[in-house]
């Protein structure tokens, strides 16, 4: 399936239906009063997060979405039917942005979440509404109020527990393929991975979701190599696994380049828990391995794990280290949620 994580679409809610002009007509009632009903309300534009989707590719082929108009009012004081809603089904993790691409209108983070983006117009009044003591046979009605319309952007930010970051050809896709059933494209040249990939990883009796994004380059925070869109896919992760290619000449420069891009991108990426790993150690001599590990540790100012996605060396240890960070993050999130709930529950009521 092709991957699309950003698109622009046009939305319009339904116009309200017109009110009716009608008069009561029954046997033995010669001059029945007005009984024209109101028009129906126009359909809403609704966005819904659904399970089983991980791309916005459907919105490449259809960019205009319009809800139906409300039904006409009818005699005997019957209101028109409500217009049919336009429901946009999107993957979990989709954000709806205003035309400026900055203002977030909706953030779809849970399966089944539904948000009304545009409300349908109200139905018009039928002539029964205008009946009065001085106007007993009105022929007035209103046509219904127009619906809302706007252009919006849909932006998908994948939801994963852990994210893989690193320069192109750092071995991220090889690692993902080694620990999950994901099958990203793998080759011995930079920029093999051009779209994000998700894999479900089994660590003991627990599972977590790992995201592999295309390799970052210098200037990614400014959009070079579509870097800003790729970085958005690791915004929601709980921990980052930073892979550094051990066969590179300068592992310190490789590490600092990615850290700089994370810091300049913002969004809290630079503050996320980070595990640093020297990858492709199967291609290094013992002397090269120790030399580069020491260099990388000096730049990262933290322990450096050793890894080879190709041979499996260090993979299991890495999975349980990732799981440990994920557990800690989940625990902190649960405590924060409990604290918020406690404050709401015991907040003083203002009279």
UniProtKB/Swiss-Prot annotation:
GO CC entries: cytoplasm
Chief location bin: cytoplasm
Pfam families (alphabetical): GTP1_OBG, MMR_HSR1
PROSITE patterns according to UniProt: G_OBG (PS51710), GTP1_OBG (PS00905), OBG (PS51883)
Known EC number: 3.6.5.-
Keyword check for Nucleotide-binding: yes
Coiled-coil positions: none
Location within or outside the cell: Cytoplasm
Gene3D superfamilies hit by this protein: GTP1/OBG domain, P-loop containing nucleotide triphosphate hydrolases
Enzyme class per UniProt: hydrolase
Name the record gives this protein: GTPase Obg
Encoding gene per record: obg
